[in-house]
Structures are given as structure tokens and as C-alpha cells.
Amino acid sequence: MSGSPRAEPKYVAPDFRSPMLSSAPAAPTAVVEADGVLPDNFFATTNLPTYVKGTNGRWAMPREPRMDGCLVRDVDGVYWVREGRRVRRGDAVVVGLAEDGREGVLVHAHGFHFEDAAHGDFHFMSSQVSREKPIDYRQIAQLLVEERKREGHVLWVAGPALVHSRARDNLVWFIRNGFVQGLLAGNAVAVHDIEAAIVGTTLGMTSNGEPTVGGHSAHMRAINAVRRAGSIEAAVTNETITGGIMHACVIEHVPFILCGSIRDDGPLPGVITDAVAAQDAMRAHTKQATMCVMIATALHSIAVGNMLPAYYEDSQRGIVELPTICVDASEFLVSKLKDRGTHQAIGVVTNAQDFMSILRVTVEAEIAGAR
């Protein structure tokens, strides 16, 4: 049976009639003098709800929010969050350091509130990280089911341990059942998933963890097979790849962004090896995200966390917190993610196999209970 409805925090907007905010000046700007070079004292953005006072006297939220960016005012008076490398000579960039609104920029850090009855419920902004904290799989399952019903954009960020730990089949299930709208991963995830599909091993080992003869080269043979086909998509079409995560993404038309690193073998065709281009491709998805699940990958989780706002704007519900779930066997990663500024993240300290298996069963029960 389905549990009680998930408690959702209510967003309370700032009182712009208060003396300080009503009398605040329009956010000052300075002109960019050279491409990619920000003015001194540029305002550095956070991932929290932010408002900018325009020259028309109105407070508005900038578009495409993220942390570690700047605020650029376009010719129509609309404010956008942009990475510093993207500014161009002549752009108007907001300057100032104050976040309390007195200089025309307000970071509304405490806008989300729970009703008293739900004060002790599972939620994101105040979640602490501990391996001793029980995992409320039902609440996470409810989130996923709600997002699918609303046709949200759920991003999954995956590390290779997900493939090695037998959680692969469960991720395939989530993809095939409409719970994944984008997959962000590195070359290794795709390589070992495809190795499993073609050779039947990951890192040369069977699903029981037993080494195979010549297994050290299995991943290279998988890469070579995809290179022969020309692309991952072509390898699915010609049935070189007949199952697994990448196969499911291609068949279900789920976009995937594979980013390279200095340690990669191959890489596979389609892997983005330019770090800035990879960031841009990932950012195209984080701008659309309504939920994010990160599993067993430190660098990718932190990179995506840096791009995610803590909220998004829903046409029906207004400003909504962006649920971000970070799963890892180590408390270090999930704590590090929060320390780096992804305050909305809920840390789940467990291994990928257990998490994916239990979550799938719980989601299936949630779907059955809603019928």
C-alpha cells in the first residue's frame, strides 16, 4: 500500500515591502571590458533563491540559477546567471558583495518552511549525513513517482561502482519505466556497462566476482566493438549491444552525457573529452532538472552539484526545492557535497547495489498502491 503523501515544504517569498528592501537601490552593474574577464567586486551567485532589483524598481529572480556564477543584465532588463568564462565585452554584470538586499541583491536562504505537523518529516534542506540514520526509501520512491506523473526532468548521476555492484539491471528498469530523463556519467560507466553487454564481465570479472581468462582486456574489446560500429547508438542499432544501461538509454531515447578524464581507456565514441564542453553539455540538463539522484561517484556528483540550483520554478506550485539525493558507501562524499554548497542534498550512506534494489522494490510497491 502507498504511504501517506510526502510532506512538501512551503516557499515563503521575501517581504519586499519591508523598509530595507523597498528602499534598496537597483542592483549596480559594471561593464565587462574583455571577454571572460569579470569586473572587480562582481556579485558571486549561490544556488539559493535569489532576487535582483532592476532599474524598474521590481525584484525578480535571475534565470538559469547556479552557484559560482555572475549576474548579467540583458538589453531587456532580464538578469541571467552566467559562468564567468561566458561574459563578453560590453555585458552589464552586477557588482556588490551584500546578500541581504541592501545593495539590490537578496539571497533568500531560509525561504522553505514545513508545517509544524511535518517538522520531523524527511526533507532536504535540513538533512544531516550519517550511516546510522535510517533511509526512508518510501519518501524517495514517492518523489520519483510524483516526478514521473508531473513529467519532470529527473537526472541520474552514476559512477562505475553501480555497474560492478549488480545495480545495473535496476537502473535499466528505472530507465525503461520513465524515471530517468537524463544520465550523466563518465566514460568508465559506459565502457563497463557495454563490456557486460558484449562480453558478460565487468573489469574482466563475472557477476560473481570471479576473474576470467584474458579478462584484463575485456573492456578494451568492448571499446573496439563500439568504435567499429561508429557510435554507441549505431552499436545498439546493429545489435552489437543488446542490453544494459546504454542500450536502454538509446532504445528509450533518454539522453546521456559521457565525460572523459585523464585516466580513460578509449575513450568511447561520443565521450566529451573537452572539460569545458562537458560542463556545457551537463549544464543543459541541470537547468531543466526537477530532481537529481547521484550514485557512487565523487567527482561527478560534486561537479553536478555545483551546477544545480537548490530550487526550481514550477508553473503550478511556484518555487519548489530541488530534491537532490547523493548515495555513497562513504560518509565523506555525501558530507563533502554539502560542504561544497549543495545544501539541499540528502546524503544516503549505503552501497549502490542495496540502494538500487530496495528503491526499485519500493517504487514498484508505490505504483501498485496507487492503482
Regions inferred by a protein language model and the residue ranges of each:
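Short acidic, glycine/serine/threonine-rich loops at helix termini
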Residues: 105-109, 166-170, 193-199, 268-271, ...
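Loop/turn positions that initiate beta-strands
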Residues: 88-96
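Active-site pocket-lining segments that scaffold enzyme catalytic pockets across diverse folds
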Residues: 144, 148-156, 160-178
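Gly-rich Lys/Arg/Thr-decorated short loops/hinges at beta-loop-alpha junctions or inter-strand turns
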Residues: 113-128, 223-229
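Gly/Ser/Thr-rich loops at beta-strand to alpha-helix junctions
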Residues: 99-100, 158-165, 188-191, 264, ...
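Active-site histidine-anchored catalytic micro-motif
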Residues: 154, 172-175, 179-226, 294
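Long terminal accessory regions outside catalytic cores
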Residues: 1-79, 83-88
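C-terminal functional extensions of proteins
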Residues: 206-207, 211-256, 261-292, 297-371
